UniProtKB/Swiss-Prot annotation:
Record PTM: The post-translational modifications that lead to mycofactocin involve oxidative decarboxylation of the C-terminal tyrosine residue catalyzed by MftC, introduction of a tyramine-valine cross-link, removal of the modified C-terminal dipeptide by MftE. The released dipeptide then undergoes oxidative deamination by MftD, glycosylation by MftF and methylation by an unknown enzyme.
Pfam annotation, one family: MftA
Site (Cleavage) location in chain: G28, V29
UniProt miscellaneous comment: Mycofactocin is classified as a ribosomally synthesized and post-translationally modified peptide (RiPP).
Family: Belongs to the mycofactocin precursor peptide family.
Alphabetized NCBIfam families for the sequence: mycofactocin
Free-text function comment from the UniProt entry: Precursor peptide that leads to mycofactocin (MFT) after extensive post-translational modifications by enzymes encoded by adjacent genes. Mycofactocin acts as a redox cofactor of nicotinamide-dependent oxidoreductases encoded in the same locus.
Assembly, per entry: Interacts with MftB.
Protein's recorded name: Mycofactocin precursor peptide
Length: 30
């Protein structure tokens, strides 16, 4: 894998984690 691919993968993983945390946070609030 080249660096660009690794960077894109890292971004996708980060976005997925952020979405999961946001959903968990909203569920926790309500």
């Amino acid at each position: 894998m080249d660096r660009e691919t690794e960077a894109e993968t890292a971004e996708l993983v980060t976005e997925s984690l952020v979405e999961e945390v946001s959903i968990d946070g909203m569920c926790g609030v309500y």
